[in-house]
Curated annotation (Swiss-Prot):
PTM annotation, UniProt: Sumoylated on Lys-444 and Lys-476; which promotes enzymatic activity. Desumoylated by SENP1. Phosphorylation on Ser-421 and Ser-423 promotes enzymatic activity and interactions with NuRD and SIN3 complexes. Phosphorylated by CDK5.
UniProt superkingdom: Eukaryota
Family of this protein: Belongs to the histone deacetylase family. HD type 1 subfamily.
Molecular function per GO: E-box binding; histone deacetylase activity; histone deacetylase activity, hydrolytic mechanism; histone deacetylase binding; histone decrotonylase activity; Krueppel-associated box domain binding; metal ion binding; NF-kappaB binding
Gene (UniProt): HDAC1
Residues bearing PTM N6-methylated lysine: K432
GO cellular component: cytosol; heterochromatin; neuronal cell body; nucleus; NuRD complex; Sin3-type complex; transcription repressor complex
Position(s), cross-link Glycyl lysine isopeptide (Lys-Gly) (interchain with G-Cter in SUMO): K444, K476
Species whose genome carries this gene: Bos taurus
Protein name: Histone deacetylase 1
Pfam families hit by this protein: Hist_deacetyl
Gene3D superfamilies cross-referenced by the UniProt entry: Histone deacetylase domain
């Protein structure tokens, strides 16, 4: 499969300002506030100018039950801290209460996480972006009818199901320190999704992900597990990740990739025991990106929150092919990053218990399994189901300028690099406003026009022919989940 180096690709990014308000409870290691810290840091690096930012819709119960059981989702919708006593049996049944506590806004939190991942998949399916990013997603432990490992709704599975409407084969890669058990379980018997997980194994949550777990039935050899020991460093990780992923790409030939970027595999993580730096972790993103496939990047674990924000900010920059300085810009959470106030972290002096012999032995075993794969299974072409979410609204230039827009619409209006300066103020006019935005938007250089031959044409409803409308409603012939 062809690789490209340094190719600029269109990136869209999903974020809701409310996500940082959710709180698992005192002493709980999972802190949604880390998503807000990440967002604030990448804003202050100016990365917002280089990508489209969207506020996700709140995924509804119908979307979630494309994978999860009806009674489990109904339970998540109903449970609250003030009515827990009425649901004690169901809490036990659905594994909610300890690692996965009941907290205020639990279901809304799941809606935002899931909404961003599903919307990202729809964007990729419509070829409206090359890379989609949702750092609030990546909750890989959730099962069909059970919460697990701080995860309630498996946004990854739901996003992959959406991708499968348009893509014959989807590759899932997991670089979280914990095994991606929930995603593997969901696709264990299909040959249309390959799951690849690099994780700590042996007396460590969730206890799954043995080298010998390879899938079943049609899915035999489509689950790939690389069990690791404590202390793996950048050099060792790169030495296994690149050859394994190259072989996977060659044998499976996916047409879309989902990369779970759990940052608990970093050195110094509160719950982790690996020794990766941010650069080492991001090399995985860079390598997967080089295959030039539609890519969904998701969050996941990460419990030293200052390093989570550093890591996901840097990996957003990698997706954008943008260099950012090691000196952190001033931001709302600047004091979290002391005493050095730098982007990158140093590895610790912990021992790497993964010897070269051990890593080579596991790698060769995985290669043997991958050689058992038939080359790129074919899939029957079928009419595709409709998208999970409706079309985005039309051109803002056609809107009534006297009508106040919603916060959601406002969040989608992102300044491109050439449109605004670093400052929030433009000359004597003070703050940026909608009319300035529109004027700037209309100004296009000849260069840009050459780069963007498929420039959107402004078309009014009256100009659309009935024939075009009929065509838009037509059923596309594409693949359907077998």
């Amino acid at each position: 499969m062809a690789q490209t180096q340094g190719t600029k690709r269109k990136v869209c990014y999903y974020y809701d300002g409310d996500v940082g308000n959710y709180y698992y409870g005192q002493g709980h290691p999972m802190k949604p506030h880390r998503i807000r810290m990440t967002h604030n840091l990448l804003l202050n690096y100016g990365l917002y100018r280089k990508m489209e930012i969207y506020r996700p819709h709140k995924a509804n119960a119908e979307e979630m039950t494309k994978y999860h059981s009806d009674d489990y989702i109904k339970f998540l919708r109903s449970i609250r801290p003030d009515n827990m006593s009425e649901y004690s049996k169901q809490m036990q049944r659905f594994n909610v209460g300890e690692d996965c506590p009941v907290f205020d806004g639990l279901f809304e939190f799941c809606q935002l996480s899931t909404g961003g991942s599903v919307a990202s998949a729809v964007k990729l399916n419509k070829q409206q972006t090359d890379i989609a990013v949702n750092w609030a997603g990546g909750l890989h432990h959730a099962k069909k009818s059970e919460a697990s490992g701080f995860c309630y709704v498996n946004d990854i599975v739901l996003a992959i199901l959406e991708l499968l409407k348009y893509h014959q084969r989807v590759l899932y890669i997991d670089i979280d320190i914990h095994h991606g058990d929930g995603v593997e379980e969901a696709f264990y018997t299909t040959d249309r999704v390959m799951t690849v997980s690099f994780h700590k194994y042996g007396e460590y949550f969730p206890g799954t992900g043995d080298l010998r777990d390879i899938g079943a039935g049609k899915g035999k050899y489509y689950a790939v597990n690389y069990p690791l020991r404590d202390g793996i460093d950048d050099e060792s990780y790169e030495a296994i990740f690149k050859p394994v992923m190259s072989k996977v790409m060659e044998m499976f030939q996916p047409s879309a990739v989902v990369l779970q970027c759990g940052s608990d595999s970093l050195s110094g993580d509160r719950l982790g025991c690996f020794n990766l730096t941010i650069k080492g972790h991001a090399k995985c993103v860079e390598f997967v990106k080089s295959f030039n496939l539609p890519m969904l990047m998701l969050g996941g674990g990460g419990y030293t929150i200052r390093n989570v924000a550093r890591c996901w900010t840097y990996e957003t920059a990698v997706a954008l092919d943008t260099e950012i300085p090691n000196e952190l810009p001033y931001n709302d959470y600047f004091e979290y990053f002391g005493p050095d106030f730098k982007l990158h972290i140093s590895p610790s002096n912990m021992t790497n218990q993964n010897t070269n012999e051990y890593l080579e032995k596991i790698k060769q075993r995985l290669f043997e399994n991958l050689r058992m794969l038939p080359h790129a299974p074919g899939v029957q072409m079928q009419a595709i189901p409709e998208d999970a979410i409706p079309e985005e609204s039309g051109d803002e230039d056609e809107e009534d300028p006297d009508k106040r827009i919603s916060i959601c619409s406002s969040d989608k209006r992102i300044a491109c690099e050439e449109e605004f300066s670093d400052s929030d103020e433009e000359g004597e006019g003070g703050r940026k406003n909608s009319s300035n935005f529109k004027k700037a938007k209309r100004v296009k250089t000849e260069d840009e026009k050459e780069k963007d031959p498929e420039e959107k044409k402004e078309v009014t409803e009256e100009e659309k022919t009935k024939e075009e409308k009929q065509e838009a409603k037509g059923v596309k012939e594409e693949v359907k989940l077998a």
